[in-house]
């Protein structure tokens, strides 16, 4: 009997997105919310960004598998919007299984998910090397070239692995194209056909038990009354369409991508939680109006920025690269809120601001003397933005582990209240430390 026949109330779907340039602390919040979800869904990106979880003092970094895998009994889904490296997937599965977690029986992969192949990685790395000083900061893991193949309708997908002859024919055709680019344009070495074929087909039997029609399964789960959590990677300002182009990632990181990248109707997305760090960070190249510190730029060595980097442990969880740091940019945050239709914010890493004499909030910009209240769309224009700040008194008290609003220092509350006012949406959660218990809940995304 169908769910509708027995009049089951559909479950609630919550989307978690980063509102900055990634690294906002989404992993911890997804893990916290998973207490109230029966499934967690990845809908875009690949293994180029990591989610760091601290549970019981133990650090775990997940790059591809949804954070819900840390909770027994929670189903995890990799949607069609993801680009999948089987090598990275099975490495991560192995690490989790060594830690005693059950993975394969709870992980479901869309048959329409695009595969990352060795030639994607070779092209990614050769292209970035060729750019020299003009590099865009790719992780070199083949994400961008895999998405290029998807848009160019050349991509090999997970379901193609189960027809060896057709897979071989299409692989040979793809290699003819990509090896020409590698050798004749990028000056790299050709990728071997047989070695690639053997490697990829070797994953087929291991993948097959986890492959399913994810779109249908999510529909059925929702209509059976189960809550689903959609876990975004990277951040809105890295979105291929809405970010500081061309210094962006290769996928859509915004809330709307949850519908397309998992195969669910957009009206089924009930609540959008925007994750916002209490300050800003950025990895790699690209404009950053409120920047204070960049390890690679001698002109960006502000001591407060260095403090934020050190106290916040701002190093990429996958690449290890130091992150650039700066004050929270509310004008950029407003842009993200509008694009995503954010229902409420979760402010993370508030504790990193503890001990500062003053805290600044970028509320807009000056461009050629003109006032601008929203982050511009193009990188060239963003680079011309001069930040306009409001200044708040700092707080000397520690906020680490505080789990109620009233227990926060008065100046911390004043800062957060002003962020809400400028952003135009409520702060529904505040993170005061890396552990899942170090959280202030003001409104519950699954219960609003």
Swiss-Prot record:
Pfam family, one: Adenylsucc_synt
Catalytic residues, chain numbering: 23, 51
The keyword Transport belongs to this UniProt entry's keyword annotation: no
Key words of the record: Cytoplasm, GTP-binding, Ligase, Magnesium, Metal-binding, Nucleotide-binding, Purine biosynthesis
Cellular localization per UniProt: Cytoplasm
Principal location class: cytoplasm
One Gene Ontology cellular component annotation held by this UniProt entry: cytoplasm
Gene Ontology biological process: 'de novo' AMP biosynthetic process; IMP metabolic process
Reactions performed catalytically: IMP + L-aspartate + GTP = N(6)-(1,2-dicarboxyethyl)-AMP + GDP + phosphate + 2 H(+)
Binding positions (Mg(2+)): 23, 50
Binding site for substrate: 317-323
EC class (word): ligase
Binding residues annotated for GTP, in chain numbering: 22-28, 50-52, 323, 349-351, 431-433
Entry keyword Transferase: no
E.C. number: 6.3.4.4
Chain's role: Plays an important role in the de novo pathway of purine nucleotide biosynthesis. Catalyzes the first committed step in the biosynthesis of AMP from IMP.
Subunit text: Homodimer.
Assigned protein family: Belongs to the adenylosuccinate synthetase family.
The name this protein goes by in its record: Adenylosuccinate synthetase
Organism: Burkholderia mallei (strain ATCC 23344)
The gene coding this protein: purA
